[in-house]
Curated annotation (Swiss-Prot):
Its cofactor is Mg(2+). It catalyses: ATP + (deoxyribonucleotide)n-3'-hydroxyl + 5'-phospho-(deoxyribonucleotide)m = (deoxyribonucleotide)n+m + AMP + diphosphate. PANTHER family: DNA LIGASE 4. Residues 696-775, 954-1064 form the BRCT domain. ATP binds at residues 295, 297-298, 302, 357, 387, 452, 457, 474, 476. GO terms for molecular function: ATP binding; DNA binding; DNA ligase (ATP) activity; metal ion binding. GO terms for cellular component: DNA ligase IV complex. DNA ligase involved in DNA non-homologous end joining (NHEJ); required for double-strand break (DSB) repair. Pfam families: BRCT_2, DNA_ligase_A_M, DNA_ligase_A_N. Its main location: nucleus. Residues 1-20, 825-928 are annotated as: Disordered. This is DNA ligase 4. It comes from Cryptococcus neoformans var. neoformans serotype D (strain B-3501A) (Filobasidiella neoformans). It is found in: Nucleus.
Length: 1065
């Protein structure tokens, strides 16, 4: 059993070893087919920029058509070799230009030189400090390429780019020749600056940084290029090979042509992680009571080991195709590993591919070190732990069942006495299981020896390259409430985000106070940091909490919830840190961008896998932290390392001597809330924050309910919820009529009030009536109220000026002594509505596209028209493009190339940065629901929906994790249901809905017995099969039965709405 040292998980070694550093595995020397030669003229680079602008601005379902259009035009006008184009669309997958050694800081210095900027000028500082918010400045921040675009545009005299695609590729090749200094880069970038417009340079910078920000990756691009392209890429990771092998769109590969090959890196199979990670559900998903395999999960780097020539040649690469052969040894007697294991294989093993985990072994204490922590350790104590065999003696084994591959691996036919290679070559510890009890027992055994966790695998499945799913599921201790570490810490600083989080705090620095002196005064704070980006917090709440925009309230009653921390964040001076901070001896990158005084801050409770030694002020840090709760009603003095919260170090872990009180989840702040019902309090996933047992000071809100400002109204007797219940009197929100939740409630006639109403009521110690000025939306009942049309000043005079008997001096219906003052506008400091990140990015991209298109010359417009870029009446407006007409049959055919292409576009998501045996799908804080209205019940419907990796909400594919059955007469006949004769209007509505579902990522099922089925669409005018469908689809989980209106409203609102409001009549 593995014994893990308590070190931080570190990325694979990227430092230079003997003058070398890891790069993408080099492309195998290929010979270009004779008829794969471009004979036409390469297009101007601004044509490609035009396509990139469109890809960034378009919705996902339109990207596929755009890609097929550009590929078709290229083949027609240039030739069959699309490699020069595709390498620009996928710069991070280009093996021939693996690294530029150019990051934002170096590019900023280069452009300061190229643009002749004074180093301390505002323009130069904008380039250097591109992440920092610009305040009221219109200049963008957080997107380095866009910041450069604005500075270049203000100074460039180039009106029309002079470079072709071929010329741009040649210049990029020069930048990627090797590690150079600034003086070497400047002449090349200066040549680009003199021949390219600001727009073209923006895209070249994005290519250099290997992130185009177009929300599409290899799956989408290659699926549009050729139907077999992604299958071939999965087993070779080589764009050139894909382009030169599949240059003919009519050519199709045989199955044996997508097998794994020796010395070709491939994209390995990865683990999925269930959202409801109870051991019972994991066991069920993995096939229990059938036998499954449990392997110990290791803290290393996923590695592919290739050997051929009976041990003469060796090749090592990571799961992201980084070549580490130079480190571990290409031939016997070389490297830190090959020299020790060259004789481990049986004599009859000519060639082999093994899948495993690279570890660092300390033979002195006989334990594993966190991989990549020490360069010398990586050189001296490399160990590969093998868990799979995928190729043997010229035969690919990936299509063999896992149980067969495991049997072969451990049969003694592959290795000689493997026990003799302990510390260099070993099998992964594994055990067979049949139920949740077996998983629990093995997990406890692993945890007792400080192991990482488990990976459970089905035994009867083949090896699927570049896939995640429930065939392999990881089980980590911290996913269980009984395991891991929970603690409450004070937020003390943060780092500015970039990209979609520009202008916002994306990472937090947290800490604890040292033990108090005897006289009760406080010592310095000790600080810990969270490298992760607020895991578990919805992004919209991060915006509310820390962004420089927040809710609006009256000038006289500033609230805790409006601009709560806008004035509290202060720039952090690295040379003169705040006196209350005690930071460790770490590099400048570990100092925050901003800090906040403890008395102005707030407390968060985090859960982490463990607490490990680190170089920070407290001497320790958290591993895999995730935010669970946020508290505003706690004092910073409570978070000290004193006798009441004593920490001791033992075996590399911390153990708290006091028990934490478990609190009700603050689920409205978290991504993917789970449904749990409490008859007395309403749906648990919509309850507000859990407050401490503070005394209730008044009862002025005892009959009201609020969804925001919980801490404030709690003191005055109110309850709060995040769900709309039948007995609610109001919903307290920011004045935002565009919020989908708000619009949904407005449609149901619910009063929507502004936060000001709360503050003014508290100031008067009475609940104000619903005045017009405090209502975002007023129901008919509210509009009929006695005081609805009165101003607050009028109401004050009516209600609060009374004689000794308590009677009003001014008649309640009169206005004799009242000045009739009506508000004629919103407060000047009202904020913009916070948009979803993706929607905002697309909107800004469309605006940017319109601006750029308006500056095109006549010649450019003609050339764009020839390349299919000016087919729209309104360029850049994705809503103005006519929808492609196609039959329902064609649109719903999941086997069609277009359907597969659209699916690939939707599946294009960023992989995690961790090159490990695990997959962190579902952990990242970016996976969030825009509005916690409804969704799959994780506990009840965790196995329903399209696929495990689709269980994460995305606003561009809101139905992607769902599967739908449409209750048409035709489908009813197929499924043996009661027949009907619906009207033409009913049929037309259902056809329209099916098209909407597919365009927005949903899957349409024809059978009611489909195991992934989640929803049934039924029209009000043809609902006779409601009871029959309810009964026949009740097992194993009941399905949502909704009308077509639910689909239409979800698409309009760009989020999933509550199904209960759309049941058929």
């Amino acid at each position: 059993m593995a014994v893990h040292a308590p070190y931080n998980h570190a990325p694979p070694p990227t430092q230079e070893i003997n003058g070398q550093k890891p790069t993408l595995a080099p492309a195998i020397t290929l010979e270009r087919p004779a008829d794969c030669i471009n004979r036409g003229q390469y297009p101007a680079f601004y044509i490609i920029c035009g396509y990139l602008n469109r890809l960034r601005a378009d919705a996902p379902h339109k990207k596929y058509e755009l890609l097929t259009r550009i590929f078709g035009n290229w083949r027609e006008k240039v030739g069959p070799d699309l490699y020069p184009l595709i390498r620009l669309l996928l710069p991070d997958k280009d093996r021939e230009r693996p690294v530029y050694n150019l990051k934002e800081s170096m590019l900023a210095r280069c452009y300061i030189d190229i643009l002749s900027l004074e180093k301390h000028s505002e323009a130069a500082q904008r380039l250097i400090k591109w992440k920092q918010p610009a305040g009221n400045s219109p200049n963008p921040t957080g997107d380095f390429a866009k910041v450069c675009y604005n500075e270049i545009k203000a100074r460039s005299t180039v009106e029309e780019g002079q470079l072709s695609v071929e010329a741009v590729n040649m210049l990029l090749d020069k930048l990627a020749v090797g590690k150079m200094k600034q003086k070497d880069y400047v002449p090349i970038l200066k040549a680009i600056n003199m021949q390219c417009t600001a727009e073209e340079q923006e895209w070249i910078i994005r290519i250099i940084l290997k992130d185009l920000h177009i929300s599409i990756r290899e799956r989408g691009v290659l699926s549009a290029f050729h139907p077999d392209a992604i299958d071939l890429y999965n087993v070779c990771s080589d764009l050139k090979r894909v382009c030169w092998t599949l240059y003919d769109p009519g050519f199709r590969l045989n199955k044996n042509e997508t097998h794994l090959e020796l010395f070709h890196s491939f994209l390995p199979q990865l683990c999925g992680r269930m959202n409801d990670a109870s051991l019972e559900n994991i066991a069920k998903a993995i096939g229990a009571p059938k036998e499954f395999i449990m392997e110990e999960k290791l803290d290393g780097e996923r590695i592919q080991l290739h050997m051929r020539g009976n041990g003469a040649q060796w090749f090592y690469c990571s799961r992201k195709a980084k070549d580490y052969t130079y480190l571990y040894g290409a031939h016997p007697g070389e490297g830190s590993l090959t020299r020790y294991i060259a004789t481990a294989f049986q004599d009859n093993v000519r060639n082999v591919i093994l899948d495993g985990e690279m570890m660092v072994w300390d033979p002195v204490v006989e334990r594993y070190l966190a991989f990549g922590t020490l360069k010398s350790a990586a050189l001296a104590f490399s160990l590969v732990k093998v868990f799979d065999i995928l190729f043997l003696n010229d035969h690919c084994l990936s299509r063999k069942r896992l149980s067969e591959r495991k049997r072969l691996l451990r049969s003694g036919k592959i290795f000689k006495n493997i026990e003799n290679y302990k510390g260099r070559l070993e099998f992964v510890d594994e055990k067979r299981g049949k139920n949740a009890k077996d998983i629990r027992e093995y997990l406890e055994r692993v945890v007792e020896t400080k192991g990482e966790g488990l990976v459970v695998k089905k035994t009867d499945v083949i090896y699927q390259t570049n896939s995640r799913g429930y065939d392999w599921i990881k089980v980590k201790p911290e996913y269980s409430d009984q395991m891991g570490e929970n603690l409450e810490v004070l937020v003390l600083g943060g780092w500015w985000g970039k990209g979609g989080r520009s202008g916002k705090i994306s990472r937090l620095l947290c800490g604890l106070r040292e033990q108090a002196f005897d006289d009760g005064t406080l010592q310095d704070f000790l600080f810990n940091r969270f490298w992760n980006e607020l895991l578990g917090l919805r992004v919209d709440f991060v915006s509310h909490l820390m962004h420089l925009r927040s809710m609006r309230c009256s000038p006289t009653h500033l609230s805790q919830c409006r601009n709560k921390h806008k004035k509290h964040w202060r720039p952090f001076d690295r040379s003169n840190p705040p006196p209350f901070m005690k930071l460790g001896p770490v590099g400048l990158d570990d100092k925050p961008d901003v800090y906040i005084e403890p008395e102005n801050s707030f407390v968060i409770e985090v859960k982490a896998s463990e607490i490990v030694p680190a170089g920070y002020g407290i001497g320790f840090t958290l591993r895999f932290p995730r935010c669970k709760y946020i508290y505003y009603d706690k004092n910073s003095r409570d978070y000290a390392l004193d006798d009441e919260c004593l920490w001791t170090v033992g075996q590399g872990f911390f153990y708290k001597t006091r028990k934490l009180i478990k609190r009700t989840d603050f689920m409205d702040l978290f991504s993917r809330p789970k449904r749990s019902y409490d008859d007395s309090q309403g749906p648990g996933n919509f309850r507000g924050q859990k407050l401490s047992d503070a005394d209730v000071e008044t009862s002025i809100f005892s009959d009201m309910t609020f969804s925001d400002l919980e801490a404030l109204v709690h003191k005055h007797g109110a309850d709060f919820t995040q769900a709309q219940l039948s007995d609610l009197s109001a919903i307290v929100i920011s004045p935002d009529q565009k919020n989908p939740l708000v619009r949904a409630q407005i449609r149901h006639g619910v009063n929507v009030i502004k936060p000001e109403w709360v503050f003014e009521s508290i100031a008067r110690r009475t609940a104000l009536p619903f005045l017009k000025e405090f209502l975002v939306f007023a129901s008919e009942e509210a509009q009929d109220g006695r005081y609805y049309n009165k101003t607050l000043e009028q109401y004050d005079k009516v209600s609060f000026v009374r004689d000794r008997t308590g009677g009003a001096l001014v008649d309640e219906d009169g206005d004799a002594d009242v000045e009739d003052e009506i508000m004629d506008g919103e407060d000047k400091d009202e904020i913009d509505v916070e948009e979803s990140r993706e929607s905002k990015n697309r909107r800004m991209a469309r605006e940017d596209l319109k601006e750029k298109e308006s500056n095109r010359t006549l010649e450019q417009k003609k050339l764009q028209e020839a390349w299919g870029l000016r087919s729209r009446a309104s360029p850049g407006d994705s809503d103005s493009e006519p929808e492609e007409e196609m039959s329902l049959k064609e649109e719903s055919d999941t086997d069609s190339e277009r359907s597969r292409g659209l699916r690939a576009i939707y599946e294009d998501e960023e992989d995690g940065e961790n090159d490990s045996h695990e997959s962190d799908v579902g952990v990242n804080g970016d996976d969030y629901r825009a509005v916690p209205l409804s969704g799959l019940n994780d506990k009840e419907e965790g196995l329903m929906g399209e696929s495990p990796e689709a269980m994460h909400y995305d606003e561009d594919r809101i139905f992607y994790h769902l599967a739908f059955y449409i209750d048409t007469a035709k489908n009813a006949a197929v499924n043996g249901l009661e027949s009907s004769s619906p009207s033409f209007d009913t049929q037309e509505r259902l056809v329209k809905v099916e098209k909407l579902l597919i365009e927005n990522g949903g899957r349409v099922a024809r059978s009611i017995s489909d195991p992934k089925l989640t929803h049934i669409i039924m029209d009000d005018e043809d609902s006779r099969r409601y009871v029959e469908l309810t009964r026949k689809t009740a097992m194993p989980k009941r399905k949502h039965i909704v009308t077509p209106k639910w689909v239409e409203d979800c698409v309009d609102e760009e989020t999933l709405l509550d199904e209960d409001l759309y049941k058929p009549k």
